[in-house]
Structure formats: structure tokens, C-alpha cells
UniProtKB/Swiss-Prot annotation:
Name by which UniProt lists this protein: Keratinocyte-associated protein 3
Transmembrane helix recorded as keyword: yes
Keywords: Membrane, Transmembrane, Transmembrane helix
Membrane topology according to the record: Multi-pass membrane protein
Family per record: Belongs to the TMEM54 family.
Source organism per UniProt: Bos taurus (Bovine)
Cross-referenced Pfam families: BCLP
GO cellular component: membrane
Segments crossing the lipid bilayer: 21-41, 63-83, 95-115, 163-183
Length: 240
């Protein structure tokens, strides 16, 4: 029963759902990529330095977030192509490979961002500005005090709020990327007839639906041609 719920790709609504998932991946990927870029521009570029004052979890989480956004956009494009070309095995395998990689990367991104948020909340953002304020590693020293405060090129009281305001949406975006990538994996496995999502007669059903849709598309094209011809004739008469 659980397997049936997970393997939700069918011949009737599966291609349209795959197309919507592809569009959603492109949108979510762009948003996550934008959040990662804004985070780097507003927070990490101030506190990152060669001396390693910024702990690796912050930089790693941000890099993975940007990479996950780029890969999600690529996966969305492949999903759109696969939804319109249901009988091309190469697209199915490409969809499966990209979906698996993006699923793992998005899951790692979510965990990394959760770790970054947890550490930042636990120490009150002091590790973000440890190089500018060496004395602030002591939790008894307020953020707006301590040695080096006058030499900081940024406002230390805003770095904490800005980082959290950008990290928390990134966590949800990464979780959404992982969920959508999981659906793409299911769709690719179903189309290839591999694993527990295999459905007998799916290819035949898709072929029948394609054959039924082809005359309808042809009829719509003919109607459009007739409308265009009428418009041309009307314009010619009005010109005469």
C-alpha cells in the first residue's frame, strides 16, 4: 500500500505532474541560488578571511546550497524534456541520475543549513564575527562591545539577524528540492519499469494516450490555420 502511494506516476496524470515538478524545480532552484548569493554578499563576504575565522560549516553549507540550486534548475529542465518525450530511454536515465544526485545534495544541504542555524543560535552569532571581535567568544561579552568593535567593516548586530533570515528559507527550499527530486526518481523508475515502481502496460497506455492526443492536436492546428486565413482575407478586403 505504501509502495503504491510512493509510486504515484501513472499514464493519465503522470506526464503533466512531471512537467509541473520540473517547473517547480526550476523556480525553487533559482530562489535557493538567489538566497545563497545574497547570503554570501551580505554576510559571508564580511566575515570570511584567509585566517579561517569563519568555521567550515558556514562556508560549506552556503556552497552546497548554491550547488543544489544550480543542479535543481538542470533537473527541472530535464524533467520538462522527459515529460514531453516519454519514449526516450536516455532522457529517463538522465532524469534518474540527476534526481538521485540532487536528492542527496539537497538532503546534505538541508542538514548543513540546520547545523549552521543551530550553531548560530546556540552561540548567538559570536562565531560569525570571531575575527572582528576576538573577545566576543566569551558569552558574557555583549555583541556591541569588546575589542575590535570600532574596526569592523559591518554592523555586528545585524549579521546575526540577516544570516538567520536567509538561512531559514534556504532550509525549506532545500527540503522542497529533495522532495521534488524524489518524485523525479519515482517517475524515472516507473518509466523504465525498474524496481518496486514498475507498472505493467504503462508504455502501452502512454502510446494509446499519445495516439488519442495526436488527432486532437492536429485538429487544433487546423482550426488555428483556418482562423489565420480568415484574418488575412478580412485584412485584404478592408485594404481593398
Amino acid at each position: 500500500m505504501r509502495c503504491r502511494r510512493l509510486c504515484a506516476f501513472d499514464a493519465a496524470r503522470g506526464p503533466r505532474r512531471l512537467m509541473r515538478v520540473g517547473l517547480a524545480l526550476i523556480l525553487v532552484g533559482h530562489v535557493n541560488l538567489l538566497l545563497g548569493a545574497v547570503l554570501h554578499g551580505t554576510v559571508l563576504r564580511h566575515v570570511a578571511n584567509p585566517r579561517g575565522a569563519v568555521t567550515p560549516e558556514y562556508t560549506t553549507a552556503n556552497v552546497i546550497s548554491v550547488g543544489s540550486g544550480l543542479l535543481s534548475v538542470s533537473l527541472g529542465l530535464v524533467a520538462l524534456l522527459a515529460s514531453r518525450n516519454l519514449f526516450r530511454p536516455r532522457l529517463h536515465w538522465a532524469l534518474l541520475a540527476l534526481a538521485l544526485v540532487n536528492l542527496l545534495l539537497s538532503a546534505a544541504c538541508s542538514l548543513g543549513l540546520l547545523l549552521a542555524v543551530s550553531l548560530t543560535v546556540a552561540n548567538g552569532g559570536r562565531r560569525l564575527i570571531a575575527d572582528c571581535h576576538p573577545g566576543l567568544l566569551d558569552p558574557l561579552v555583549p555583541l556591541d562591545q569588546g575589542s575590535g568593535h570600532a574596526d569592523c567593516p559591518f554592523d555586528p548586530t545585524k549579521i546575526y539577524d540577516t544570516a538567520l533570515a536567509l538561512w531559514i528559507p534556504s532550509v525549506f527550499m532545500s527540503a522542497a528540492e529533495a522532495a521534488l527530486s524524489g518524485y523525479c526518481c519515482v517517475a524515472a523508475l516507473t518509466l523504465r519499469g525498474v524496481g518496486p515502481c514498475r507498472k505493467d502496460g504503462l508504455q502501452e497506455q502512454l502510446e494509446e494516450l499519445t495516439e488519442l492526443e495526436f488527432p486532437k492536436r492536429k485538429w487544433q492546428e487546423n482550426v488555428q490555420l483556418l482562423d489565420q486565413t480568415r484574418e488575412i482575407r478580412t485584412s485584404q478586403k478592408s485594404w481593398v
